[in-house]
Regions:
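Acidic two-metal-ion nuclease catalytic site recognized across multiple nuclease folds
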Residues: 1-7, 165-232
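Active-site catalytic microenvironments for nucleophilic, acid-base chemistry
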Residues: 121, 142, 163-170
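Conserved non-catalytic scaffold segment of RNase H-like nuclease domains
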Residues: 1-112, 117-120, 124-151
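Generic secondary-structure boundary signal with a strong preference for alpha-helix termini
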Residues: 77, 105, 126, 156, ...
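Acidic, divalent-metal-coordinating active-site segment for phosphoryl/phosphodiester hydrolysis
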Residues: 152-165
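Short runs of predominantly hydrophobic/aromatic residues within well-ordered alpha helices
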Residues: 115, 157-160, 205, 209
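Short, charged, surface-exposed loops that flank catalytic or proteolytic processing sites
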Residues: 150-153, 173-175
């Protein structure tokens, strides 16, 4: 028998996609990632346009400015994502559940860290300095971080990384600690967003809770908490 194969240490990747829109099936038009170490130092980065093999919705084009002509000669998602394959990856990003719905099937995902969930947990506005929502641009402005080509994949990966660094620094946390904590879902007690924001989860209408679960675009903490309330 040959010698046992050693476990491969997962890569740490901050990832973002720009897409064809929100209508399924959703395609990727731009893919970017920044590979980091546990000290959140950048090791390398990657950015490419992607041929989604479907039409780009006008609303999506209005956000990222990527046209059908721009992606006509670009690699497909299966081709573009190959450099991340062949090893497990911890995937980090803002609302990373959305990106993983699209690209997760191409990856060996060891775990994920969502900066949207971290911002909801740790960032609190005040009457003098309100935090209106937890969108990436809003959080960046709230933290006085530099604007890095918003709504383009590589710019958003660097902004997500800066948000991660800032939250961890301000709260005395390490990436290693966050990864270990994120491995287990956190039980939420109040609705973090939307028309029922701030309401005790058990008081949110059952139909709305089930609709959220069916939408399939939730961070793991909220999905776990909703399923605890309604195991069916």
């Amino acid at each position: 028998l040959g010698a046992p194969v050693a476990d491969i240490e997962p890569s740490l990747v901050v990832l973002d996609t720009e897409t064809t829109g929100l209508t399924a099936p959703i395609g990727v038009v731009e893919l970017a990632w920044v590979r980091i170490n546990m000290d959140m130092e950048v090791l390398d980065e990657f950015d490419t346009l992607v041929n989604p093999e479907r039409d780009i919705e006008p609303g999506a084009f209005g956000v990222h400015g990527i046209s059908q002509q721009d992606v006509a000669g670009a690699p497909t998602l299966a081709e573009a994502i190959q450099p991340l394959q062949g090893q497990p990856v911890y995937v980090i990003g803002h609302n990373i559940a959305f990106d993983l719905r699209i690209v997760g099937g191409h990856l060996d995902v060891a775990g994920d860290v969502c900066t949207l969930a971290l911002s909801r947990q740790y960032l609190k506005g005040t009457p003098e300095r309100p935090l209106l929502n937890h969108k990436l641009t809003t959080v960046r402005e709230f933290l006085d971080l530099p604007c890095l080509d918003a709504h383009r994949a590589l710019g958003d990966t660097h902004t997500s990384l800066n948000v991660l660094r800032r939250i961890l620094h301000d709260h005395g946390l390490t990436l290693d600690k966050i990864i270990k904590r994120q491995a287990k879902p956190r039980l939420l007690h109040t609705m973090p967003f939307g028309k029922h924001a701030g309401l005790t989860l058990s008081l949110v209408p059952l139909e709305y809770r089930r609709w959220l679960l069916g939408a399939g675009n939730l961070d793991k903490d909220l999905a776990y908490s909703l399923r605890k309330l309604d195991p069916q």
